[in-house]
Regions:
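Sec-dependent signal peptide recognition
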Residues: 2-9
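Bacterial N-terminal signal peptides
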Residues: 9-15
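Carbohydrate-interacting regions of secretory-pathway proteins
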Residues: 18-247
Length: 247
């Protein structure tokens, strides 16, 4: 009998010892989940069917050269008008953004050129988005002559900083572009690789601008809040899965 009592007591002790840590672990996990801030939700900037949320830079509806097909927003550049497209033009988001993480997939036609411009100040003072907003270059590196110019290749912070690594895919394939701007800290990411990192609105930033083609544009790279623009550079370009997250 004494041996049975001993075994019962020992068994209960072991059961208690085994269950207690599990309870603590579960509690710790619950606290961790509760105390972790929830990330801001992604906001879709393109529903795959309409131009809702976009307009032509300077006002008005999106031009007819911009089209939607198979969930893609693309520029039909068949009708040339100088360096841009007839009834095309740059398009911008209706909404402005300050601290954000922007994503889109892009695909360029052979010999094509385009860009994603951000922190754009849309006003009558400026004729084009690139007069105020920095640009992540979209380019056919193998076919377009701009690729011969350092800091003009796909993924570069156009005319300011060259990518530290070339990760662009061959023409006709989809590339994932990301722009992360947070309190002046800027990261450009192409196909999962951080290709440009810099800090805006510092003396070093001003020096970059002073040594670029934007040096005589007083509003360039100055605005801390603005629109996202997709550029019409007169070439066919496709975009899809366009979204943004406020930081």
């Amino acid at each position: 009998m004494q041996r049975i009592k001993y075994l019962l007591v020992a068994g209960l002790a072991m059961a208690w010892g085994c269950s207690s840590p599990s309870s603590d672990t579960a509690s710790e996990e619950t606290m961790t989940e509760t105390s972790t801030p929830t990330e801001s939700e992604w906001i879709s900037l393109f529903d795959g069917e309409t131009f809702t949320g976009w307009h032509k830079y300077g006002g008005g509806e999106v031009g007819k050269a911009w089209k939607i097909e198979n969930g893609e927003l693309f520029l039909d550049a068949a009708n040339k008008d100088g360096w841009q497209t007839g009834d095309g033009g740059d398009i911008v988001t209706d909404q402005e953004f300050e601290n954000f993480h922007f994503q889109t997939e892009w695909k360029i036609a052979p010999n094509g050129n385009s860009g994603i411009i951000f922190l754009v100040n849309e006003s009558e003072e400026y004729d084009y988005p690139w007069q105020t907003g920095p640009e992540m270059q979209v380019l056919d590196n193998d076919g377009h002559p701009d690729a011969k110019i350092i800091s003009h290749r796909a993924g570069d912070l156009y005319d300011l900083i060259v990518s530290n690594e070339e990760t662009v895919k061959p023409v006709g394939e989809w590339n994932l572009a990301e722009i992360i701007a947070n309190d002046g800290e800027l990261t450009l990411r192409l196909n999962g690789v951080d290709v440009v990192k810099t800090t805006m609105w510092t003396p070093e930033w001003e020096a970059l601008i002073a040594d670029s083609k934007f040096k005589d544009m007083p509003g360039f790279g100055k605005y801390k809040k603005g629109r996202i623009a997709l550029q019409d550079h007169g070439d066919i370009v496709h975009f899809r899965n366009i979204r943004i997250k406020n930081l």
